[in-house]
Curated annotation (Swiss-Prot):
Keywords: Cell membrane, Membrane, Transmembrane, Transmembrane helix. The keyword Lipid metabolism does not apply. Belongs to the UPF0391 family. The chain crosses the membrane at residues 4-24, 29-49. It is found in: Cell membrane. This is UPF0391 membrane protein PA5482. One of its GO terms (cellular component) is plasma membrane. It comes from Pseudomonas aeruginosa (strain ATCC 15692 / DSM 22644 / CIP 104116 / JCM 14847 / LMG 12228 / 1C / PRS 101 / PAO1). It holds the Pfam family DUF1328. It is a multi-pass membrane protein. HAMAP family: UPF0391.
Amino acid sequence: MLSWAITFLIIAIIAAVLGFGGIAGAATGIAKILFVLFLVLFVVSFFFGRRRG
């Protein structure tokens, strides 16, 4: 599960960079939402992954 969270976090960061860079100006809001969503998923899966060993 942690690997999925890291994968989606990287995708969200790439989308944010492209959105903030002016390449896809309309996608900026989506990139912000995805970044926050996958950052939260990353943190949650990181802590639950540590508990399971």
